[in-house]
Structure formats: C-alpha cells, structure tokens
C-alpha cells in the first residue's frame, strides 16, 4: 500500500462513519412514501453539505449525505488510455449487475466512475461498520484489479507481437 493511500482511505472511512448516521424519514410530499432524499432532493433542509475526499486530481470520492440516505460516488485513477478503457468496462460490468449489490447504483454521477446509494433501510439491515469496510475494500480491490488486468493485457500484447514478428524472420 502506498504512503498516500492509507491517509486517503482513513479520511474516507471517518467521513463515511459520520455520514452514515441515518434515520427513516417519510416523504413530506406523498403520504406513506420513504424515498432517498439525496436522490429526489425535494427539500434543501434535508440535504447536508456534500464532501469531496481527494487523493489527487483523478482519484476522489464524493459523499453526499441527507437525512435518510447517503450517495457515494467514486472516481477511479486512470493514468492512461488502457486504464480508462479497462475502468469503463469494469464499472459497466458492475453496474449491469447492480441488483446483486444492494447499495450499488445503476448509473454513476457525471464525472465519477461508480456510485453507491445507502439508505436508512440498508443501515438497519446491515452493520454500518461492515458497509464502510465493504466500500473501502472495494476501493482498494478495484485499483488492484485494473492494474492486474493492465499487466495481463500488456503481456498478451507482447506475446502476440512476438508471434507476429516471427513470420518476418
């Protein structure tokens, strides 16, 4: 783990722990409805100040808390064109399977690669610290996965190029 990753993850952890103090809050517009206020944004007084935790210009997390939900959007580091393509394919693959991940949103916010929506119902059904651990583990693993895919892709490209060039010798 790099020297800047640990403080970044700790800052995200503490911010998420503070933001996940959620409670059930019925809709002020429609009776017997409970919608995530961070998504519908009907009342400004129910939304809290969004927080951006950034490791660098490309790698950042946007945490948008409200009274009954939190939306977490993650921008994944993409240093070159290969990483951009791999990241796009990987996040698209994950978003297509959002039904299997209860807190994953199907569509990320503009400027971010993947988004999660945690509601008060999720915090009642699951442990808050486990949700935070899952998000931090996800952030670590997605970076590792993309790096491993890039190494594998480069190795396959090298083998293909060698096989192609053998024909000319």
Swiss-Prot record:
One of its GO terms (cellular component) is Arp2/3 protein complex. Its main location: cytoplasm. It is found in: Cytoplasm, Cytoskeleton. The keyword Cytoplasm applies. Keywords: Actin-binding, Cytoplasm, Cytoskeleton. The keyword Cell membrane does not apply. Component of the Arp2/3 complex, at least composed of arx-1, arx-2, arx-4 and arx-6. This is Probable actin-related protein 2/3 complex subunit 4.
């Amino acid at each position: 783990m790099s020297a800047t990753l640990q403080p970044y993850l700790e800052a995200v952890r503490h911010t998420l722990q503070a933001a996940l103090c959620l409670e059930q809050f019925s809709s002020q517009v429609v009776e017997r409805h409970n919608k995530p206020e961070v998504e519908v944004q009907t009342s400004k007084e129910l939304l809290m100040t969004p927080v951006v935790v950034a490791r660098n210009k490309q790698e950042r997390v946007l945490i948008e808390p409200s009274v009954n939900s939190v939306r977490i959007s993650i921008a994944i580091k993409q240093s070159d064109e290969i990483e951009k393509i791999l990241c796009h394919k990987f996040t698209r693959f994950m978003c297509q399977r959002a039904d299997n991940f209860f807190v994953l949103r199907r569509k990320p916010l503009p400027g971010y690669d993947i988004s999660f929506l945690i509601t008060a119902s999720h915090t009642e059904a699951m442990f808050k610290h486990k949700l935070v651990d899952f998000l931090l583990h996800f952030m670590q693993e997605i970076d590792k996965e993309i790096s491993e895919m890039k190494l594998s892709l480069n190795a396959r490209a090298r083998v293909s190029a060698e096989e192609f060039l053998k024909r000319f010798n």
